[in-house]
A protein has these predicted regions:
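Short beta-strand/loop motif that positions the catalytic acidic residue
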Residues: 168-169, 175-178
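Flexible "cap/lid" loop of the alpha/beta hydrolase fold
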Residues: 72-116, 121
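Conserved alpha/beta-hydrolase catalytic His-Asp/Glu region
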Residues: 91-94, 109-170
Length: 178
């Protein structure tokens, strides 16, 4: 069976993919570590260093930014791709400013506020009052921690514009938003 690498989004852990991991029980599944570096390129390099020679790849949001970078660095190793709720565009200036405000909160000891501020933008409006879902999101954020959050946000703000690269993707690709 072909291995599958799943790359979570900002402040997310393997918990994000629990239903997929269960559904893919017959496949080797690897959840990428995207918490230790402050650049998308370094995160991608680290994942590639731990990855099998060839694999399927899926990334959600920030994980999609990393997946596109993995394809830039080692396209021959990726057999198929899923880009989920992500964008090839770099941050607009106002997005960068919002990220800097959240980094400032995290660095000033107020990280516990961050997942609550992010939550409305992470879930569909119909799920805003879903306390079970909110608790999972907050638990993943707590597990990730403030220092990793700052590294993740720094990486996201410095990511490359992937739009010029999209035409070079030659593997079967699913793009899913919703």
């Amino acid at each position: 069976m072909e291995p599958i690498i799943l790359i979570p989004g900002l402040l997310c852990t393997e918990t994000l993919f629990a239903p997929q991991i269960a559904a893919l029980a017959d496949h080797p599944v690897m959840i990428a570590n995207h918490r230790d570096h402050d650049s998308i390129a370094a995160i991608a390099s680290s994942i590639l260093a731990a990855a099998p020679e060839r694999f399927a790849l899926a990334g959600l949001s920030m994980g999609g930014y990393v997946a596109m970078e993995i394809l830039r660095q080692a396209p021959q190793r990726v057999s198929r791709l899923a880009l989920l709720d992500t964008s090839p565009k770099p941050d607009a200036p106002e997005q960068g400013e919002r990220r800097r405000v959240l980094i400032s909160l995290a660095e000033s000891g107020k990280f516990s506020k961050v997942p609550h501020l992010l939550y409305p933008g992470l879930v569909d409006a119909s799920r805003l009052d879903d306390e079970g879902l909110k608790s999972v999101v907050i638990e993943m954020a707590i597990e990730t921690g403030a220092e990793a959050f700052v590294r993740q946000q720094t990486a996201i703000m410095g990511r490359a514009d992937s739009r010029p690269f999209l035409a070079a993707i030659s593997v079967p690709t699913l793009i899913l938003v919703g």
